[in-house]
Amino acid sequence: MDLARSMADSKKSVLVVDTDMRKSVLVGRLRAKVESGGKIYGLSHYLSGQVSLDKVVYATNIKGVFILFAGHEVPNPTELLETKEFKELIEFGEKNFDYVLVDTPPTGAAIDAAVVGKNVDGAVIVAAQNVTSSRAIINTKRTLEDSGVKILGAVLNKCRFEESKYGHYYGNYYGNYYGRDDDEK
């Protein structure tokens, strides 16, 4: 969500699509403006034909950021992501928003990221510092590339600079630099 927030801060509109229909965590993290009688519909509802696309996109408490939650858990999320409705959703996002960010489950847990990757411009591999092994990152990269997905880059998140051998240097340098008065720079 930090990436979506940064894009929105640049006056861009962003649609975040949560495709983790097995174990989503985004619905609990964001406050969506719900207008559908209190019920939050999501991707699984749309892809299974229960609701139309206009019923699943919600504004968030972040100006310019909209969300399409995963919806309820389903036994066949990969099959749903392979439907023409998912492709139509991506096309809708491209036409109506400056950016479409698609959040997928970890590739070690499911093949969903490779399926989604075929319908988007590319993938950004996100790894957690001191959690994600280098082997898992290499396997993820290989899985995506073998599926024809273009790798756009990588993000290391959950960083604790005080635990990093370089964090002390960068933290002190930039902290001191930005902490000085303009005439001292």
Which residues does each PLM region occupy?
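P-loop NTP-binding module
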Residues: 1-185
